[in-house]
């Protein structure tokens, strides 16, 4: 709220089947939304559900959009990167328009103890950072008005860590 212009563009990092891209597209003021994912299978699924949508198969952090956007959204993806904090700098410099924002949701972080065995049990790399390290990473990348909060907490689950930052 209050971080986007009345008309805005958006991209979802690690878009999977494109659910967030479709939801963004329906938001008042969204004039363009797209998604990128490293899984060709997931991009094909997104395209089959939403043939009119803009979905890109690309490996992050190397891939980047042709033009920057007002909103970069990422749910459950950034911790798969080797160095997500450096990627925040790339987002700030190359992906986000001045006045635009990033909104990130992560379930795998140090304080969420039930997520700490995911890397081993799924046999995939996951970068484990504390909530404070995630938040400080956004600040160090140059984002301002950085906020973080937890949502969906319940017994044995600390909730999703949500981070928001705005580019001046």
Ranges and model annotations:
Residues 1-6:
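Conserved alpha-helix/loop element of class I SAM-dependent methyltransferases that forms part
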Residues 11-62:
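Class I SAM-dependent methyltransferase SAM/SAH-binding core
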Residues 85-98:
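A short glycine-rich, Lys/Arg-flanked "PGG" loop and its adjoining helix->strand segment in the class I
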Residues 99-106:
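Conserved beta-strand signature within the Rossmann-like core of class I S-adenosyl-L-methionine
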Residues 150-168:
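Core SAM-dependent methyltransferase catalytic element
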């Amino acid at each position: 709220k209050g971080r986007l212009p009345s008309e805005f563009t958006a991209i979802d990092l690690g878009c999977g089947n494109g659910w967030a891209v479709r939801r963004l597209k329906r938001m008042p003021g969204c004039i363009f939304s797209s998604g990128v994912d490293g899984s060709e299978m997931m991009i094909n699924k997104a395209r089959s559900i939403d043939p009119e949508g803009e979905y890109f198969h690309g490996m992050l952090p190397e891939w980047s959009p042709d033009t920057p956007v007002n909103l970069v959204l990422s749910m459950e993806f950034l911790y798969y990167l080797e160095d997500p904090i450096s990627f925040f700098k790339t987002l700030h410099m190359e992906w986000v328009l001045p006045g635009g924002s990033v909104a990130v949701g992560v379930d795998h972080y140090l304080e969420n103890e039930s997520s700490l065995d995911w890397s081993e049990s799924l046999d995939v790399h996951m970068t484990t950072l504390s909530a404070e390290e995630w938040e400080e990473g956004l600040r160090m990348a140059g984002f301002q008005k950085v906020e973080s909060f937890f949502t969906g907490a319940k017994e044995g689950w600390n909730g999703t860590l949500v981070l928001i930052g705005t580019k001046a």
